[in-house]
Structures are given as C-alpha cells and as structure tokens.
C-alpha cells in the first residue's frame, strides 16, 4: 500500500506540473488539477477497499498520514479555486484586503481546536479511536455534514488532518500573494508620488481643512492615527504648487 500511495502522489505532482505549464487561465488550471486529484482519490479508495491492512498501525498510518496528504491537496485546490474566482478582476487594494480577511479566518480556525492541538503536539494516545475505521463513532463526528460518507474509506478524523494540511497550504499561498500585492501597491504609490499625478489645485488653507476633517472624522485606523501622520501622508501623496488662492 505504501508504494501505491507513493506512486499516486508522484503521478499527481507530475500532472500538476504539466497543467501549470499550459497556456490557459488560472481557474481552468485549477479545475484540471482538481479533476486529476479526484480521479486519484477514487483509485486509492478502490485499492483500500480491496486491501487488508497488515496491522492497526498500518491502517492508522494510512488514514493519519497517507490519505490526508492527497485529500488535503484536493481541499486546498477547491478552496483556491473559490479564492481566485472571488478576487478575479478586482483592484490590487481590494484583492489585498480580501486575502488578508481570508488569511485571518483560516488562522482563527486553529484556535480552540482540540484536535488541532492533539495533532500538532504529535500525540498518539487516541489514534486507535481517530484513525481506525472499525472504531468510528458517529456521535463523536464533528463533520456532521458528511454523515453519509463511505465508512470503508473514512475514519473519525482523517478529514480533519486533511483540512489542517489544506489550511497550511492556503496560509503559505495567501501570505505570498499578500506580499506580492503589497509590493505592487507600494511601487504604484511611489510612481504616483514621483510623477506628481495628484496635484492639489485648491488653496493650502483648504488642504489643511481637509486634513483636519480626515483626522476629526477618524477616517484612518478607527481614529488611532495622529494628525501628524495624516498630514505627512497627504504631503507625500499630493503635489502642491503655489496658488493665487493661498
């Protein structure tokens, strides 16, 4: 079984590389990758149903390590498709805010999660209950929306491990995208400042009043920004030239 799982993973990795090189849209690539993983999981399921694990330790290893590596990859790409679809055609700043919100939600999923603590600590005392099919307890199943799942290919927490792995992939991916977008936004800001694209054509008195209005209205960081910082940002962003109205 170990060799079968290893070959399955290698095949998936090769297919992903091949698809990534195709000159097609990102969403189409992700859909193709999802199809590949779904087929691989179906073949893995068929192999497991017809296989007799040598001992409980091998079954635990399969459902705690091997299967989640593949099913977690499927969860990752399904969520990635949703994320990429939601951010498509959005401005850089909107994408950045959206991804930061998604990242925060994923990180929150790890809080107050007893199984996550168990898994991350490398504990094994409950593995027989969590990763042996015969010990599956429907009353303990936190994935209540999947109660009709196939008991021949499912344990109490193999999908929990898969979700943890998927979320770890998502955190890495989203963090990288946020860094990339932030760099682009910074370069765009510098370009605007250097090119003097935004020129303040009203009086300087009006500019001062504008800055005070932003400060009084608590328009930045819920009011946790100093007047000096707001003035500095406006001075950097807005090109002011001598005006006869001053």
Show where each model-derived region lies.
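Intrinsically disordered, low-complexity acidic/Q/S/K-rich activation/interaction tracts characteristic
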Residues: 1-188
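Conserved small/polar residues in nucleotide/adenosyl-binding loops
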Residues: 239-246
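Amphipathic alpha-helical interaction modules
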Residues: 37-56, 217-238
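Basic amphipathic recognition helices
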Residues: 189-235
């Amino acid at each position: 079984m170990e060799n079968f799982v290893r070959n399955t993973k290698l095949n998936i990795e090769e297919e992903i590389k091949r698809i990534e090189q195709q000159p097609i849209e990102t969403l189409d690539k992700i859909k193709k990758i999802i199809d590949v993983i779904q087929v691989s999981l179906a073949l893995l399921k068929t192999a497991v149903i017809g296989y007799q694990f040598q001992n409980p330790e091998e079954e635990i290893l399969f459902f705690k390590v091997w299967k989640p590596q593949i099913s977690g990859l499927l969860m990752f790409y399904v969520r990635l498709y949703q994320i990429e679809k939601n951010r498509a055609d959005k401005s850089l700043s909107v994408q950045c805010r959206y991804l930061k919100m998604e990242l925060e939600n994923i990180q929150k999923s790890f809080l107050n999660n007893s199984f996550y603590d168990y898994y991350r600590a490398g504990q094994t005392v409950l593995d027989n209950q969590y990763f042996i099919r015969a010990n599956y307890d429907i009353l303990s199943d936190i994935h209540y929306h999947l109660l009709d799942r196939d008991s021949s290919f499912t344990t109490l927490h193999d999908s929990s491990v898969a979700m943890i792995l998927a979320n770890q992939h998502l955190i890495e991916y989203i963090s990288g995208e946020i860094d990339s977008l932030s760099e682009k936004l910074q370069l765009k800001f510098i370009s605007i400042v250097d090119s003097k694209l935004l020129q303040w054509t009203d009086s300087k008195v009006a500019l001062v009043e504008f800055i005070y209005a932003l400060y009084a209205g608590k328009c930045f960081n819920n009011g946790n920004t100093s007047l000096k910082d707001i003035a500095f940002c406006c001075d950097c962003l807005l090109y002011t030239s001598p005006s006869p109205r001053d």
